[in-house]
Amino acid sequence: MYKQNLFIISSNDSKYNFLLRNKKLYYEIILEGLTFILEFFFFIRLISYLEGKKNKIEKLNNLRSILSIFPFLEDNFSNLKFILDILIPRKVHAEILVQTLRYWIKDATYLHLLRFWLNNNWNSIINQNKDGYFYPQKNKILLLLYNSYVCKYESIFVFLRNQSYHFRSTPFIMLLERIYFYFKIERLVNPFLKVKDFKANLWLIKEPCLHYFRYRRQYILASKGTSLFLNKWKCYVITFWQWYFSLWFFSRSIYIKKLLNNSFEILTYHSSLNINPSFVLSQILETPFISNNTIKKVNILVPIILSISDKEKFFNVLGHPTSNLFRVDLSDYNIIGRLECIYRNLYHYLSGSSKKNSLYLIKYILLLSCVRTLARKHKSTVRTFAFQKKRLCLELLEGFFISEEDILFLKFQKVYSSLGGVYISQFWYLNIYSINYLA
C-alpha cells in the first residue's frame, strides 16, 4: 500500500518552501528585535549609573579591575593559606534568566515575549551543544542574559558575604547565630577593655579576611583561615545555588586547595606558592648564631607563548621567529596593524605583573615575525627590506615600543574597613567593556 513520505519535499512544493523561508525570516526578525531592546535596556541602565548613580560606585572603594589580578597574587597570596576554586553552573533554566530581568525591566510585554521565545527555542539551543550545557557565546541575546544572571548572582553573593545576618532562611541560621555571638561578646568586653584592644582581640575570634575574584565561569575565594572555615563556605555556596537559583550544584565543582601544596589556574595564569629558606649569620655580644628564615614567594607562570605558537605559528619548534604565510596577501600597514593589535591586547592582559620577561619575549617574537613576513611578501631578505623600507620599519618600531604610560594607568588604593585596618576583605571584579580579539 502506498504511503506518503512527509519528509520528502518536492521542488514543486513552492508554498511549503515559502512558508519555511518566512518562518525562518520571522524568527530572525524577532531575535534581532529582542536583542536590540535588551541592549537598549542595558544602555539606559549604564547611562543612569554614569550620570545619576555615581555615588553607588564610589562607595565601593575596594573594587579592583582585571589589571590588578597580578599585583593581588604577588602581594596578598603569600599571606593566604587556602583557596576555594568554584565553577559557576552552566545548566540554567530559561525561567531563571527571565526572572533576573524582572527586577529592572518593567515592560511586561517584552518579558512575556522573551519568555515565549526562550521556551520555544530552549531545546534547540541546548541540543546544539554535545554536552547539553548552556554556552552564551554562540548567541548575542544569550550572552546578555547570561551576564545579567551572573550579575544577579554576584550581587546576592556579595551581600551574603558582607551582611549575611539579613537573610532569614534556614540554611544560614548558623551564620546568623555566629554573628549574634560576636555582638554579645562585644557588649561584654567593651566595659573592661579599650576599643583598640577589643578590636585586636576580636580578630582572634572573627573569621579571617576573604578575597573574591571571578573570570568567566571560574571564581575563587581565598582566605587566611583553616580548612574548616573553607568547608563551611563550601556548604554555604552549594546551599546558595540550590536555594536561590534552583540549581543542583555538584560538590565536585568546588575544590579546596592549600596554597603551599597545590597550584591553581585562572586567567591562564598558573600560580603557586613556594617557600624559599634563607640562612642568616647574626652575632650578639660576641656570640654568633645562625637564624633560619623562610620567605614565601608567589610564582606566576603565563603559558601564553606556547598558545600563540600553536594558533598563529609565529615561531618554529626551536623558538626562532618565522614569517606568517597567511598574512602575505594583506597590505603592509594591515600586517603591521594586526600584529600591533595582538601585542596591545597581550600588554593589557599581562602588564599588571612585575615580572614582564615573557611579555618582552613576546614583543621580540612578534616584531621579528612581522619583519620576516613583510620581507617575504616583497621577496627580499630581512636586511634588504629594512634598508629599503626605513620609514615603514620606523612606524613598525613606534607601534611596538610605545610608552607604557600611553596605554595603561594603574591606581592602587589601600582599603580599610570599620575595624581600622585589622579586618580587610576585598572584592575583585573585571571591568572589560570591549575586547579587540587577536587580529
Swiss-Prot record:
InterPro entries: Domain_X (IPR024937), Maturase_MatK (IPR002866), Maturase_MatK_N (IPR024942). It is found in: Plastid. One of its GO terms (cellular component) is chloroplast. GO terms for biological process: mRNA processing; RNA splicing; tRNA processing. The keyword Nucleotidyltransferase does not apply. One of its GO terms (molecular function) is RNA binding. It comes from the Eukaryota. Keywords: mRNA processing, Plastid, RNA-binding, tRNA processing. Belongs to the intron maturase 2 family. MatK subfamily. Usually encoded in the trnK tRNA gene intron. Its retention as a freestanding gene in this organism suggests it acts in trans to assist in splicing chloroplast group II introns. This is Maturase K.
